[in-house]
Amino acid sequence: MKESIAVLGAGSWGTALAVLLAHKGFRVNLWARRPELATALRETGENKTYLPGVRLTGTIIPTADLPAAVKGAGLVVLSVPSHAVRSTARLLKPFLPKGTVVVNTAKGLELETKKRLSQVLVEEGLDRVAVLSGPSHAEEVGRGLPTTVVVAAADRETAEYVQDVFMDPTFRVYTNPDIIGVEFGGALKNIIALATGMADGLGLGDNTRAALMTRGMAEIARLGVALGGKVLTFAGLSGIGDLIVTCTSMYSRNRRAGILLGKGQSLEEVLDAVGMVVEGVRTTAAARELACQHGIKMPITEEIYQVLYKGKPVGDCVAALMERPRTHEVESGDW
């Protein structure tokens, strides 16, 4: 048996990663915040709430005891929603040996501070942090379908350590030193998935979806590069790769939420119907404020913000985007 790994967060993604790591021979302590969920996982051998149909092997140990989950773990995987990253880090820190690698898998920004989640973890005293991102729906990873992702960290040793832990015949992992770009790509694509979902809900067709994805990628890269990311990162797995899967997949919560909004449901009704965290809602507000602070144009993000927080009709956003003043496609383009 290999070293043990703690996966904190027993939602769909945490469960899928626990299954992947257990398949590789690791003992996995899967921490659930709610004791009743941990009990259900132990008794049924399945996460029927968040990842039904995927069996949990005997080397996955569900628990609601955080100190027990972390004790002896060579690696900690953080799979909680973005708004819970800081509070979970504070719970984790007293029990974490110095130098333990913590891999964040949430894709979002902290709404209150507008900070990337790796920044939040470092602020809370976690000294070796990596980020795992890319086009990777839990429903497919849990079933062992081929998936390719990227891990970013401040140093190569940490990134390659995480790469080796997760690399599997069905789960290919690349490394990237650009942690800023990787995090912004993973977070901001959820906004564009809301937009494409709204277009689908309105029945606007493939042309509209393609336009939103393409111009959405321009917005993502514009803000990400302004805040220190590398432009090529946004052409990679954590950028365009994650954008494609999140904007087109039936598994995408953000796309599903957008579809329901496009069909006229209120945000409250949509969140209740989806039943799980829709990261794009909070990320839209955080990204809009960052864009305003840094003078970055993000017209799609602005329109999604108006829908989510100001009650603007979705159909009016289409007209607002289509009737913007004419401009160049590529800002640096010369004739």
Swiss-Prot record:
Instruction: Provide the residue positions that the database annotates as binding NADPH.
Output: S12, W13, R33, R34, K107, A138, R253, V277, E279
Q: Which PANTHER family does the record match to this protein?
A: GLYCEROL-3-PHOSPHATE DEHYDROGENASE (PTHR11728), GLYCEROL-3-PHOSPHATE DEHYDROGENASE [NAD(+)] 2, CHLOROPLASTIC (PTHR11728:SF1)
Function summary: Catalyzes the reduction of the glycolytic intermediate dihydroxyacetone phosphate (DHAP) to sn-glycerol 3-phosphate (G3P), the key precursor for phospholipid synthesis.
Per UniProt, which keywords does this protein have? Answer: Cytoplasm, Lipid biosynthesis, Lipid metabolism, NAD, NADP, Nucleotide-binding, Oxidoreductase, Phospholipid biosynthesis, Phospholipid metabolism
The enzyme's E.C. designation? 1.1.1.94
**Which pathway features in its UniProt record?**
Membrane lipid metabolism; glycerophospholipid metabolism
* Name this protein carries in UniProt: Glycerol-3-phosphate dehydrogenase [NAD(P)+]
